């Protein structure tokens, strides 16, 4: 399972695109109509087809094909509505759509949908420690992306999203050597932006708190 920031690094998409529909966010009545086709398949077959669609979805992401990735995650959901990875993968795609949105309103919609899908994925999160940790990394990254988006238009909203990202990260810090983790940039970038916000707002105590949490190299850029 790739984390969101790994996938964002891989995916540089042409700016002009029409996002594929995410069926997981359709109204309940429409979802029930779509899911009716599941009754044509035996249980074991449905699970295998769902797992295969997840694999194809991430293969499409590797090829920077967001629309086909979304279609595959939709297919995984149709065969198994409790497949956590269908929601998770769709959430990643929505985050990447936001990175390539044509305007602010479109980007905001994609970001909000990404967060909704992460919330849906949490309902079906397994007990596997590694899966849980990777999910938390991606979930924190989604709040970080939202915070960055709102930095120019609504700094209070940006602060809220950055604090959500930090809150997800804090439990992970107990078991992590941050200097050795490739995903530590999510945490450090979050703290860097909070440091700048609190400095600009004149909140000295909070400014010092987050400044002291940063590596020396990042402090120089403030």
Give the label of every model feature segment.
Residues 86, 131, 135, 183-184, ...:
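TPR alpha-solenoid repeat register
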Residues 89-90, 138, 145, 186, ...:
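Canonical tetratricopeptide repeat
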Residues 46-71, 75-78:
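Alpha-helical segment of the N-proximal tetratricopeptide repeat
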Residues 58, 96-105, 140, 145-154, ...:
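Short coil/turn linking the two alpha-helices of tandem helical-hairpin repeats
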Residues 77-78, 116-123, 167, 174, ...:
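Conserved structural position within tetratricopeptide repeats
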Residues 81, 126-130, 170, 219:
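Short coil turns that delineate tetratricopeptide repeat
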């Amino acid at each position: 399972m790739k984390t969101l920031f790994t996938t964002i690094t891989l995916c540089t998409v042409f700016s002009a695109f029409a996002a594929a529909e995410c069926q997981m966010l359709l109204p309940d009545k429409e979802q029930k109509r779509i899911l009716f086709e599941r009754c044509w398949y035996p249980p074991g077959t449905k699970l295998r087809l769902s797992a295969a669609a997840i694999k194809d979805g991430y293969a499409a992401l590797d090829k920077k094909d967001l629309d086909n990735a979304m279609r595959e995650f939709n297919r995984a959901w149709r065969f198994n509505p409790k497949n956590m990875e269908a929601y998770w993968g769709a959430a990643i795609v929505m985050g990447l759509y936001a990175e390539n949105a044509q305007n602010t309103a479109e980007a905001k919609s994609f970001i909000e949908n990404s967060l909704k899908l992460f919330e849906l994925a949490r309902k079906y999160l397994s007990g596997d420690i590694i899966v849980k940790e990777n999910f938390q990394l991606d979930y924190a990254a989604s709040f970080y992306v939202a915070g960055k988006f709102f930095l120019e238009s609504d700094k209070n909203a940006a602060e809220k999203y950055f604090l959500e990202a930090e809150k997800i990260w804090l439990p992970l810090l107990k078991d992590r050597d941050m200097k050795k983790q490739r995903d530590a940039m999510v945490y450090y970038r979050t703290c860097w932006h909070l440091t700048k916000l609190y400095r600009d707002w004149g909140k000295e105590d909070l400014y010092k708190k987050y400044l002291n949490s940063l590596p020396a190299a990042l402090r120089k850029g403030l």
